[in-house]
Design a protein with these regions (language model features):
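Membrane-embedded transmembrane alpha-helical bundles that form the catalytic cores
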Residues: 1-276
Length: 277
């Protein structure tokens, strides 16, 4: 039960403390991208990548935690997706339950990778387009699915299987994939392709409102909370977590944790992003 409660609280923290607070700044920029400068828009793009991860993984953690309390194992739904080195690896880590379903009931029945390279590329692309349409009958979701489908196909074409990467190459691939995924989230987040293009064009704008101070405060608090979370090691190792709280340093860190949460929870909460899907 302890692990289930811990998982639930972790998910609730991701949603209420992280996702909702980041969303305040992100929503303001996406509502009027023409009013903000390029750096503010770039911070909003990064912010939405964090927001949707904290929102949806938090939602999943809460469900997994509740199930664990009743001694049910729902399995992992996210596996550090932003550490993926390529689009295909990203989809093996993001929304694992949905990705597995599309693999088993769409990609493999279409022939998977068993009917030659060209058919493999077509099957990949079709699967990703359908996964985009699963989110809604909107042009942005269709384009988003096609965007990821094209990314997976290009990776298949250019990627070298079995090749060993140096740490620098791994870091570079991870950073490049994060940029690729973040650009895709702009299309996913936008109400229309026109709004998505306005955000992309705004990245190169030098004038406009500078919203950096708000992002710096929010991101700083989020990073501080994340570091404190790592310090408590609330990852299922219950004895370590309890031992940490028994020390003066543990009590002090807990007070700081509560203070930072109070700093972030200055406005109302919003609905889960994936509640619409």
């Amino acid at each position: 039960m302890y692990l289930g409660v811990t998982r639930f609280v972790t998910g609730l923290t991701k949603k209420v403390v992280f996702a909702d607070r980041i969303g305040v700044a992100v929503n303001a920029v996406f509502a009027a991208p023409a009013a903000y400068n390029g750096l503010s828009i770039a911070m909003a793009v990064v912010g939405y990548s964090l927001q949707i991860y904290c929102d949806f993984s938090g939602y999943s953690d809460m469900a997994i935690g509740i199930a664990a309390i009743w001694d049910f194992d729902l399995g992992k739904n996210f596996n550090l997706p932003y550490l993926a080195e390529n689009p295909s690896d990203f989809w093996r880590r993001w929304h694992i339950s949905l990705s597995s379903w599309f693999r088993d009931y769409v990609y493999i029945p279409l022939g998977g990778s068993r009917r030659g390279k060209l058919r493999t590329y077509v099957n990949l692309f079709i699967t990703m387009v359908l996964s985009g349409l699963w989110h809604g009958a909107n042009a942005t979701y269709l384009v988003w699915g096609a965007y990821h489908g094209l990314g997976c196909v290009i990776h298949r074409l250019l990627g070298k299987r079995g090749s060993q990467k140096t740490p620098w190459q791994t870091a570079l691939c991870t950073a490049a994939n994060c940029l690729f995924v973040s650009a895709g989230w702009v299309i996913f987040r936008a109400d229309s392709m026109a709004q998505a293009m306005a955000v992309f064009c705004g990245l190169f704008r030098g004038d406009g409102i500078c919203y950096i101070n708000v992002f710096v405060v929010i991101y700083g608090l989020v990073i501080a909370l994340t570091l404190l979370y790592a310090r408590f090691r609330l990852d299922g190792n219950a004895p370590t977590a309890r031992l940490a709280l028994d020390t003066f340093r543990g009590k002090l860190l807990l007070c700081v944790w509560v203070f930072l949460i109070a700093m972030l929870m200055y406005c109302g909460n919003s609905a889960f992003i994936y509640a619409n899907f």
